[in-house]
C-alpha cells in the first residue's frame, strides 16, 4: 500500500496515530525524513523505541542519529528508560552483545524507517543473513564506513514496516 501526503502535518498525524494505537515497542530510524516528522511532535510517546541504526562517530557529532532523540527525551516526549540505542562512538563487541540480549527480549510490531537518498534504510545497504538482531558493519558505501544496524531478520518480524520517503521534486511525502 502506498500513501501520499500533501504536507508534513498530514504525515505527522498519520504516524502519531499509528504509534498511539500500538503500545508495542517500535523500531525507528534516524535520517532527515524521520526528523522532519518527529521534530513537530507534541505528544508523549510511551512506547519503547529502538533506534534502528547508528553511525560510529564521536559522541556529539552532528552525524549521530541518537542526538535528535536525546532532544525529544529532554522535552519529555520520550522516556529515557524507553529509548534503546547504541551509544558508544566505536564498535564494542561486549556492548553490542548486551544490546542484542535486550533487543531479543522485545517483540517489535512496527518499524518506521526513512529511505536514504540511494534507497537504503537503517544502514542496510545489502542483503545479509545475520544471526543476531543488531550487528556492526565496517564497509558502508556512505560516510562513515563503520555503523551498527538492525538485522533484516529482526525487521521482518514486524507486522508493519513503514518506509517514509521525502519526494524533493514534489511538495509531498509518501509512505510505502
What are these regions (language model features)?
Residues 111-113, 117-153:
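Class I SAM-dependent methyltransferase SAM-binding "motif I" and its flanking Rossmann-like core
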Residues 157-176:
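ATP/nucleoside-binding phosphotransfer catalytic cores, i.e., glycine-rich phosphate-binding loops
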Residues 1-26:
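N-terminal glycine-/serine-/threonine-rich phosphate-binding loop
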Residues 27-33, 113-117:
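Glycine-rich beta-strand-to-loop/alpha-helix junction loops that act as flexible
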Residues 45-112:
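Ligand-binding beta-strand-loop-alpha-helix segment within the catalytic cores
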Residues 41-48, 77-78, 153-159:
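Short, conserved loop/helix-junction motifs that constitute active-site signature segments
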Residues 39, 50-60, 121-125, 160-164:
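Active-site histidine-anchored catalytic micro-motif
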Residues 24, 109, 159:
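Conserved acidic residues
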Amino acid at each position: 500500500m502506498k500513501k501520499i501526503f500533501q504536507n508534513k502535518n498530514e504525515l505527522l498525524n498519520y504516524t502519531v496515530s499509528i504509534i498511539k494505537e500500538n503500545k508495542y515497542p517500535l523500531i525507528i530510524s534516524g535520517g532527515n525524513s524521520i526528523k522532519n516528522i518527529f521534530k513537530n511532535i507534541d505528544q508523549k510517546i510511551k512506547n519503547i523505541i529502538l533506534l534502528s541504526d547508528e553511525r560510529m562517530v564521536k559522541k556529539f557529532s552532528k552525524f549521530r542519529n541518537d542526538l535528535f532523540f536525546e532532544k525529544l527525551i529532554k522535552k519529555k516526549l520520550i522516556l529515557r528508560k524507553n529509548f534503546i540505542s547504541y551509544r558508544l562512538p566505536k564498535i564494542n563487541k561486549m556492548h553490542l552483545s548486551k544490546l542484542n540480549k535486550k533487543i531479543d527480549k522485545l517483540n517489535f510490531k512496527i518499524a518506521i524507517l526513512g529511505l536514504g537518498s540511494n534507497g537504503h534504510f537503517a544502514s542496510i545497504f545489502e542483503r545479509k543473513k545475520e544471526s543476531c538482531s543488531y550487528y556492526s558493519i565496517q564497509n558502508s558505501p556512505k560516510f562513515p564506513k563503520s555503523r551498527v544496524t538492525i538485522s533484516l531478520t529482526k525487521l521482518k518480524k514486524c507486522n508493519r514496516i513503514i518506509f517514509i520517503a521525502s519526494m524533493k521534486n514534489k511538495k509531498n511525502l509518501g509512505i510505502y
